[in-house]
Amino acid sequence: GDPLITPTLPAPALLPRAINQPMAGGTDTDAPQVLEQLAVADQQWRPRAEPLPGGGTRYVYRKRPGDPDLSLNQIKALMLNPPTFSRERQVIDQLWRRLVQLGVRLELTQPRKVGAAGEWDPARVTLRIKPAVVDKGSREFARVLNHEAIHVAQSCQAGGTRAQPQPLGLPQQLPPQLRNVLQEPTYDRATAREQTLEREAYANQEQLELGLSLLNLHC
């Protein structure tokens, strides 16, 4: 019979949050250690073929919310040439090192806000990323780190890493999947300025090289 194709969704995408109050605790981590953990997590994005008890084959692959379904030919092509996430890993390494150069402390720890993937705390010059983001692999981690790096650049624009962030004047057109993100309860008490800061970061987080450019320009 025809092969079965089974896409599986990872856990709901974690949305970065930023500019929260300080939270004690957390552990410093270095880039090589994180990249090592991400290399393991990236294996989940390799499609696999599973033999069925009655004969035939089932092809299983993971997809992110909003991604189109893959055809059998596309799945087989991915199995022959699995994603390396080399661009994402390079971005993570460069961003991480630049942030450390700027005196930013990076912690893999639970952010203060429930459900947050990441947060930038200028008062403590600390950037926190939820450990579960590592489990999602390099693509998601690069996106979250880039989002938070944009917030760091917003602080630099205001005078330095310890300054309260100010808008950079970036485009604020949100992609369809994030169109309602600022209507979540998390942002109920956000000021107009805070909404603008978040809109800038969300609208540009997919431009993975942008965070580093903004840090170099403003910090």
Predicted segment positions?
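Short pre-active-site segment immediately N-terminal to the catalytic Zn-binding motif
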Residues: R128-L145
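A mature extracytoplasmic/lumenal domain signature
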Residues: Q110-R112, P131-V133, C156-G159
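Auxiliary, metal-adjacent structural segments of Zn-dependent hydrolase domains
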Residues: L4-P7, A18, D28-V125
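Extracytoplasmic/secreted proteins, especially bacterial periplasmic and envelope-associated proteins
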Residues: Q90, Q94, E140, V144, ...
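Bacterial Sec-dependent signal peptides at the C-terminal "C-region" and cleavage site
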Residues: G1-L4, P12-A13
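Short alpha-helical hairpin
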Residues: G118-L127, L174-L182
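Catalytic Zn2+-binding segment of zinc metalloproteases
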Residues: A149-P167
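Metalloprotease/metallohydrolase-associated module, dominated by Zn2+-dependent proteases
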Residues: P3, L102-V104, R112, Q164-C219
